[in-house]
Design a protein with these regions (language model features):
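Anion-recognition interface
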Residues: 1-402
Length: 402
């Protein structure tokens, strides 16, 4: 059987996390079907990507050492189809791409396929700024848009965005040595499409039954404009005082993902008129270029042509009353969480108190005092040392704590 690797390299905000959730959740069943998704933890492919590209990432890179090689070892030991998926791979340099492909056996008997999922820029740009905000960035939306439109792309924001979102460039780097029929471009359907259509496209490409592995959870809802403005300002207050691991737990997961996303009545973020025209022109140019390349398109290139403009609400100058309402909701959420944690802490303190009292009662027994004396004597008395050894053999390893 020919070893086959499907290498999904992005882009962010195109259903990648959603697909990875399905693959990770069903990895045991997929293995029975002959498809390997090699992961012992949900972020295994993320850590492997960090390792491959030697990216700093809030301290997580320290966990990533050797992760790429471990992933590759699993893939190369598997005789059938394997899937690797993480969106940050899209920004890999040509040198890093060459290392990745060579390590996976591209020059040997491995059939490597490059998978890239794309969405129109008019939706991608606002989504990327919101993702920045959720990762504790505090840059205003207007400045973010200016950075992206800078022809020099001198800012870190622009370099990252275009590194993972400029479709022709990403595929130039990843697919230069790959036959065109093994380069698969999955397009994200336009708004209003069947919500399962994107998954059906991925499933068809991966060779699995979309119905058997149908997602049960709804996709993550986006932050609205006032919520985005509020979280950005919150970042300004927290960035110098709150460690990354606490921000991930309290702000990104608990506050944003579980509570503020999808808050009713909030307008969704879009582009101002001039940025919309610019992004639309870029999108059409991109589609024209991709149409000439002969890649396998899973979907329709027209999906990458932006739809009509929607009304723009500026998060940098939004109605302060609405932002304040979002802030009050956030305060209520945090207060409830603080109360829950205090109750849990009080319960744990009570359990510790009970266990401490039980331990003290045990230490007061004649048996325990006798064992303590025997242990103390064994340091200087050979007979006591032999007696302790015999006692431990009779009682087993559990007595070694004495």
């Amino acid at each position: 059987m020919t070893r086959r690797v499907l290498l999904h390299v992005g882009a962010p905000k195109t259903g990648t996390s959603f697909v990875q959730d399905i693959l990770f959740t069903h990895r045991a069943t997929l293995l029975e079907r002959g498809i390997l998704y090699p992961a012992d933890r949900h972020d295994a492919h993320f850590l492997a990507a960090l390792d491959l590209m030697e990216l700093p990432w809030g301290g997580l890179e320290r966990e990533a050492g050797g992760a790429w090689d471990r992933l590759v070892d699993e893939v190369r030991a598997w005789p059938g189809t394997a899937i690797i998926s993480h969106e940050i791979l899209g920004t890999a340099s040509r040198v890093q791409v060459a290392r990745a492909l060579e390590s996976l056996g591209a020059n040997e008997d491995t059939e490597i396929h490059i998978v890239y999922s794309a969405r129109d820029l008019v939706r991608q740009i606002p989504a990327e700024w919101q993702e920045n905000v959720k990762h504790r960035r505090a840059k205003e939306y207007g400045q973010f848009l200016d950075d992206l439109r800078d022809e020099q792309r001198s800012s870190q924001v622009a370099q990252w965005f275009w590194g993972v979102q400029e479709v022709p460039d990403v595929l130039d780097r990843w697919a230069e040595s790959i036959p065109r029929d093994r380069v698969h471009l999955v397009t994200v359907p336009p708004p209003g499409s069947n919500p399962t259509l994107l998954w059906e496209r991925f499933a068809a490409l991966f060779g699995i039954d979309a119905q058997e592995f149908a997602p049960t959870d709804k996709a993550n809802a986006s932050l609205g404009v006032p919520e985005s403005a509020m979280v950005r300002r919150l970042n300004e207050r927290l960035n110098d005082v709150l460690p990354n691991h606490q921000y991930r737990t309290l702000v990104r997961e608990m506050l944003v993902h579980r509570n503020l996303s999808g808050r009713p009545g909030s307008p969704r973020l879009s582009l101002p008129e001039d940025a919309y025209r610019w992004a639309s022109d870029l999108g059409r140019s991109c589609v024209s270029e991709l149409a000439l390349r002969g890649y396998d398109v899973v979907g329709d290139l027209d999906d990458l042509v932006p739809g009509p403009a929607v009304p723009f609400a500026d998060p940098d100058e939004y109605d302060e009353r609405e932002v304040s309402e979002a802030a009050i909701d956030a305060l209520a959420i945090m207060t409830n969480e603080s109360a829950r944690l205090r109750d849990a802490e009080a319960e744990l303190r009570g359990e510790i108190k009970d266990l401490t009292a039980e331990l003290e009662r045990f230490r007061g027994t004649r048996t325990y005092r006798g064992k303590e004396r025997l242990v103390a004597m064994s340091h200087t008395n050979p007979v006591a040392r032999v007696g302790l050894a015999i006692y431990r053999r009779l009682r087993g390893k559990s007595s070694r704590s004495t």
